[in-house]
């Protein structure tokens, strides 16, 4: 019987920095007895314990591969000399919860995931982790957990779905993704598409397992995981069903044990330079606005000083290169075909736009990883050359002004107008705007203002994909500006500004906008203003009170009490 397993001495890192308390000595006999029941033999108590945290479920195709991949990780941990222990956490499907009460819970799930992984890892004193995720909020939730725990960790993405294919009534044939269905709903409601074609699109959009295929939030965060150095190089782009994913899973299991041997922890990797690399890659791909929210939250957990201003500072230097959906023509599978994320990273590194000395989960630097992979050049079509970009600056911008003194976020990659000015149409929450659009009350040139959808006021900072999809489907995508203290889906297209801070419930200027007020957005100057006299605005504040809280019990009530501004990443604490 193994009762004692000696710790390492000298300068060599302890490969079991946390689990000795449950494996070593007489007092650990009860814990060892429990561990024997789940498969430990005498020789296993000397091995590092690796938590394999999986957000697998059967609710959404995004996570279907994770059961298979977790088992491959387990094999890799064994091969590396560790003992793997799989445990689960939740995941919410944004695609299913979109446009109704369920979306209040989406961003909340990010915190639940991070908290639940922390809880298991801390309670069981597990030494290291491999964190598997497939849907929008589970990716940042896992990365937040890694940063918070600061143990040896590797992140692994489930992979994206293959595009669907549809043939419409008029003979048109095209690839489709989930976002096409949201836009088809709007087109059908506006009489621009038949119910038959809507049905055809519905049946085609999800041909199998994997996350939504464009450069939407899940794929953006997968690219960020790789750019941060928290995922194995080349692991973000292969589709979910591709067996290369099993190889990456096995290697991730081996890698985390090697990180323990070398004493490398998450915060050794997740430095300010790593976050700057992640922002640069996001800008080059034209990634989701949600990346801003999530990177701020992950950086806070890593104790890295990341501010909204960093996104503009970096974005002004980085060209937008990815011709990717929702605004472009291609999907993540196409990125994989031309070499994956390393192709973009090498191009940026060669141009002096990345920190090549940033450490990664391989134990090597970013530059060393790219030299070993030797990725191909940018193909020039899916990923444009640096001297022939889609836009000269990055795909995201932070705006500030009298309407958003705390900041707002816009995906400039799809913003066709440099300057937009129009009269406000104000709605308390999303449903009112949907009803007005259906009734034909929203016209070209309007600025649709949806408020009380912020982190605290929603609560949960819902994504506005239902209304943006409906606006585009109605043929108004280039003619109506939508702004909100809520969020937008990574699949949103059109003139959209989100994350307006302070939010309405906190008496931000958005709370005092009235129908007919002129609002002006100037993208080149990154300004965002309410063109109302200051004296008039002050008069509107007299006697003002926010809308009453919608939820007084349960997780949403707790969340509303704890959550901070979107300008700080909507973190809780």
Swiss-Prot record:
Q: What EC number(s) does this enzyme carry? A: 4.2.1.9
- What catalytic activity is recorded? (2R)-2,3-dihydroxy-3-methylbutanoate = 3-methyl-2-oxobutanoate + H2O; (2R,3R)-2,3-dihydroxy-3-methylpentanoate = (S)-3-methyl-2-oxopentanoate + H2O
Q: Which Pfam families match?
A: ILV_EDD_C, ILVD_EDD_N
Active site per the UniProt annotation: 489 (proton acceptor)
Which coenzyme or cofactor does it need? [2Fe-2S] cluster; Mg(2+)
Q: How is the cofactor bound?
A: Binds 1 [2Fe-2S] cluster per subunit. This cluster acts as a Lewis acid cofactor.
Q: Which GO terms describe its biological process?
A: isoleucine biosynthetic process; L-valine biosynthetic process
- KW rRNA processing (keyword) present: no
Question: Which InterPro entries does the UniProt entry name for this protein?
Answer: DHAD_IlvD/Edd, Dihydro-acid_dehy_C, DihydroxyA_deHydtase, DiOHA_6PGluconate_deHydtase_CS, ILV_EDD_C, ILV_EDD_N, IlvD/EDD_N
This entry's Gene Ontology molecular function terms read: 2 iron, 2 sulfur cluster binding; dihydroxy-acid dehydratase activity; magnesium ion binding
Residues recorded as binding [2Fe-2S] cluster, renumbered to this chain, are 62, 135, 212
Q: Which family does it belong to?
A: Belongs to the IlvD/Edd family.
* Subunit comment: Homodimer.
Q: What is this protein called?
A: Dihydroxy-acid dehydratase
Q: Which organism is it from?
A: Renibacterium salmoninarum (strain ATCC 33209 / DSM 20767 / JCM 11484 / NBRC 15589 / NCIMB 2235)
Q: Give the gene name.
A: ilvD
């Amino acid at each position: 019987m193994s009762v004692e397993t000696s710790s390492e001495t000298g300068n060599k890192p302890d490969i079991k920095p946390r689990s000795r308390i449950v494996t070593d000595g007489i007092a650990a006999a009860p814990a060892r007895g429990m561990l024997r029941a789940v498969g430990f033999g005498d020789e296993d108590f000397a091995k590092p314990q690796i938590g394999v945290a999986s957000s697998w479920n059967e609710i959404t195709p995004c996570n279907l591969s994770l059961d298979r991949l977790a088992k491959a990780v387990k094999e890799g941990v064994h091969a590396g000399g560790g003992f793997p222990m799989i445990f689960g956490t939740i995941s919410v499907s944004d695609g299913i919860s979109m446009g109704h009460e369920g979306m209040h819970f989406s961003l909340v799930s990010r915190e639940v995931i991070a908290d639940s992984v922390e809880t298991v890892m801390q309670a069981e004193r597990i030494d290291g982790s491999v964190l598997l995720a497939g849907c929008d909020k589970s990716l940042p939730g896992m990365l937040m957990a890694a940063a918070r725990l600061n143990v040896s960790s590797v992140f692994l993405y489930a992979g994206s779905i293959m595009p669907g294919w549809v043939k419409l009534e008029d003979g048109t044939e095209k690839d489709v993704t989930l976002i096409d269905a949201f836009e088809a709903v709007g087109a059908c409601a506006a009489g621009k598409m038949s119910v038959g074609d809507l049905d055809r699109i519905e049946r085609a959009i999800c041909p199998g397992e994997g996350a939504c295929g464009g450069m939407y939030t899940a794929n953006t965060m997968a690219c960020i995981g790789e750019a941060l150095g928290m995922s194995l190089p080349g692991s973000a782009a292969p589709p979910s069903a591709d067996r290369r994913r099993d190889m990456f899973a096995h290697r991730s299991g081996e890698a985390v044990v090697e990180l323990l041997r070398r004493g490398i922890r998450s915060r050794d990797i997740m430095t300010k330079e790593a976050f700057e690399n992640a922002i640069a890659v996001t800008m080059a791909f034209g990634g989701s606005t949600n990346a801003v929210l999530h990177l701020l939250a992950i950086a806070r957990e890593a104790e890295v000083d990341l501010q909204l201003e960093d996104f503009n500072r970096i974005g002004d230097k980085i060209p937008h290169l990815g011709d990717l959906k929702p605004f472009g023509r291609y999907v993540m599978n196409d990125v994989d075909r031309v070499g994956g994320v390393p192709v973009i990273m090498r191009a940026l590194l060669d141009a002096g736009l990345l920190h090549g000395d940033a450490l990664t989960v391989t134990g090597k630097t970013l530059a060393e990883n790219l030299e070993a992979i030797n990725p191909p050049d940018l193909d020039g079509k899916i990923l444009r050359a640096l001297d022939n970009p889609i836009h000269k600056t990055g795909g995201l911008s932070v705006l500030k002004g009298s309407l958003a003194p705390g900041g707002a976020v816009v995906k400039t990659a799809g913003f066709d107008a440099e300057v937009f000015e129009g009269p406000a149409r104000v709605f308390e929450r999303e449903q009112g705007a949907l009803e007005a659009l259906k009734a034909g009350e929203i016209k070209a040139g309007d600025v649709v203002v949806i408020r009380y959808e912020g982190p605290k006021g929603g609560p949960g900072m819902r994504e506005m994909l239902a209304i943006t999809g409906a606006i585009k489907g109605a043929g108004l995508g280039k003619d109506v500006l939508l702004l909100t203290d809520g969020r937008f889906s990574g699949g949103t297209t059109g003139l959209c500004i989100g994350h307006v801070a302070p939010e309405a419930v906190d008496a931000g200027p958005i709370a005092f906008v009235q129908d007919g007020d002129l609002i002006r957005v100037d993208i080149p100057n990154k300004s965002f203003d309410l063109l109302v006299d200051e004296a008039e605005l002050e008069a509107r504040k007299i006697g003002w009170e926010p809308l009453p809280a919608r939820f007084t019990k349960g997780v949403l009530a707790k969340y509303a009490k704890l959550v901070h501004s979107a300008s700080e990443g909507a973190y809780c604490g």
